[in-house]
């Protein structure tokens, strides 16, 4: 693993002020507001990437996060204490489009515009393997959280592929008519949700390679999908400038669309802006091309509009154990901030 030198101060976290639009209260170091996390300070901005940051995700323990983007590198960061970029993973020949952690936090997986998936040992920084098989940009990646650690990926080549993380070879391919841009795998590993440029979200049953349902409502490209913690709801984002929740429980009613959230927008960059559930699934978050992070209650109320970035916010993630939100941007920076 490449390590940052101590002199590279630009990779450290810096205290910043961030305004909650709902009540315009400042959250600053020494604020009288009750602290809600173990962060050293309520809000930090991290520097280190040399190009647009497209994705950032916490590891399952919540002690670390990884970020990647157009500079073809994955940066590894501490969350608590003196927040620093402690390692750099190199090897992809194209932009890092998505990344995931293994459930034991020892492996980092990524998808890339170079048509491959890659995995690294997050402790040693050693490359583990490269997964080859896609014939176009790999836009998104998800990992099964229980049982065998399966990977799912979708690509501009109009296919969704399933991989055994222990092998280089693809174990299943599903072909669609249009390029695919988003994927999420159900907790039990029998269903995969995929979205593409046609605006439809399809539920594929991996046991019989059958599309069991199509979730309709979006009118433009699906940019991100995420399953709720209990597996009952699917969160989606689209270039139609809406974020939606769908009921994906077995034998759900015909009207599966539960919520529509508005506010977050997609701009001329046409980046695949991400969405995320909070740790208790009470809140959802999304990036926006207007440089803000949007957070809603799952019941539909807009709770926060968080400024600070100077470019499109491409991805957000919630901490698995504390009230902390992570965001990354085309401005090459990353924010860590607590929610109160």
UniProtKB/Swiss-Prot annotation:
Pfam families: WD40. GO terms for biological process: mRNA cis splicing, via spliceosome. WD repeats lie at residues 48-87, 91-130, 133-173, 175-214, 217-256, 267-306, 308-339. One of its GO terms (cellular component) is U5 snRNP. Keywords: mRNA processing, mRNA splicing, Nucleus, Repeat, WD repeat. It is found in: Nucleus. SMART domains: WD40. CDD domains: WD40. Involved in mRNA splicing where it associates with cdc5 and the other cwf proteins as part of the spliceosome. Belongs to the 40S cdc5-associated complex (or cwf complex), a spliceosome sub-complex reminiscent of a late-stage spliceosome composed of the U2, U5 and U6 snRNAs and at least brr2, cdc5, cwf2/prp3, cwf3/syf1, cwf4/syf3, cwf5/ecm2, spp42/cwf6, cwf7/spf27, cwf8, cwf9, cwf10, cwf11, cwf12, prp45/cwf13, cwf14, cwf15, cwf16, cwf17, cwf18, cwf19, cwf20, cwf21, cwf22, cwf23, cwf24, cwf25, cwf26, cyp7/cwf27, cwf28, cwf29/ist3, lea1, msl1, prp5/cwf1, prp10, prp12/sap130, prp17, prp22, sap61, sap62, sap114, sap145, slu7, smb1, smd1, smd3, smf1, smg1 and syf2. PANTHER family: U5 SMALL NUCLEAR RIBONUCLEOPROTEIN 40 KDA PROTEIN. This is Pre-mRNA-splicing factor cwf17. The gene is cwf17.
């Amino acid at each position: 693993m490449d390590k940052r030198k101590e002199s590279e101060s630009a990779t450290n976290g810096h205290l910043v002020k961030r305004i909650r639009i709902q009540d315009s209260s400042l959250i600053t170091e020494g604020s009288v507001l009750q602290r809600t996390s173990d962060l050293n300070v309520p809000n930090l901005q991290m520097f280190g990437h040399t190009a647009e940051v497209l994705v950032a995700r916490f590891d399952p323990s919540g002690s670390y996060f990884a970020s990647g983007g157009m500079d073809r590198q994955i940066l590894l960061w501490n969350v608590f204490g003196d927040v620093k970029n402690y390692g750099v993973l190199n090897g992809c020949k194209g932009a890092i489009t998505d990344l995931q952690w293994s459930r034991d936090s020892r492996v980092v997986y990524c998808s890339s515009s170079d048509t491959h998936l890659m995995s690294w040992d997050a402790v040693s920084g050693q490359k583990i393997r490269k997964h080859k098989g896609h014939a176009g940009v790999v836009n998104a990646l998800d990992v099964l959280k229980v049982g065998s650690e399966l990977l799912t990926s979708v690509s501009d080549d109009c296919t969704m592929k399933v991989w055994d993380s222990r092998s280089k070879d693809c174990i299943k391919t599903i072909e669609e008519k249009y390029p695919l841009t988003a994927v999420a795998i159900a907790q039990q590993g029998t269903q995969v949700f995929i979205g593409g440029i046609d605006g439809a979200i399809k539920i594929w049953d991996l046991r019989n390679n059958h599309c069991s349902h199509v979730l309709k409502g979006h009118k433009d490209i699906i940019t991100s999908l995420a399953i709720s913690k209990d597996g009952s709801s699917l969160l989606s984002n689209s270039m139609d400038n809406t974020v939606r929740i769908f009921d994906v429980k077995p034998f759900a009613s015909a009207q599966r669309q539960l919520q529509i959230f508005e506010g977050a927008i997609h701009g001329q960059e046409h980046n695949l802006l991400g969405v995320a559930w909070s740790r208790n699934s009470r809140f959802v978050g999304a990036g926006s091309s207007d440089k803000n992070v949007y957070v809603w209650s799952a019941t539909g109320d807009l709770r926060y509009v968080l400024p600070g970035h100077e470019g499109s916010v491409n991805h957000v993630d919630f901490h698995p154990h504390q009230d902390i939100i992570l965001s990354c941007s085309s401005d090459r920076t990353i924010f860590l901030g607590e929610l109160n």
